[in-house]
Amino acid sequence: MLESPGEAPATRETAAARAKGGLLVVGSFVALLFAIELLNTVLLHSLNGVFGLRPRSADGILDVFTFPLLHANLNHVLSNALPLIIFGFLVFLSGLRVFLTAVACSWLGSGLAVWLIGAGGVTVGSSGLVFGLFAFLLVRGFFNRSWWQILLSVVLFLAYGSILFGIIPNIAGYVSWQAHLGGAAGGVLAAVVLRARASRR
């Protein structure tokens, strides 16, 4: 099929709009995390005890929806901020629906894993989202059979692949490997779901 003269500029405009939208959405989310951490610091991190995730606690299941928004301290937020911006932006380039699906699956996967198999105590932090978005970016190209997405996954793996050790219990140390594992599983699930939807079209 021949392309009309207006199609290429329209494609470039769409890509530019997605890039701007990605920076706005992901940047706003990370800014929200810092704002919450500032408030939490003023409150002596009392929010963690209220909205942090407590494994296998019947009254704490709803905390699945809040625990990624909280962190132990400023350094904890900083450690998650940059990968969230990078991975979130790259996912958003595929569109808002793809981004929301990947985030939702990573968020729920991370939370449910902690709630079901967490070691105890209170878990907070958005690292499960980091692992989920990273896993999504690693596998989606193979489901979509997209060479550029596969190439991107190889580059990301070479640059950030070492973080995958965070899903191994004995290596993860004091961080929640359950959140990392659940988030990564959610990211893979998102790639499967989105591929299935595309196949039905």
Give residue ranges: language-model regions.
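A detector for small-residue-rich transmembrane helices and their helix-helix packing motifs
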Residues: 2-201
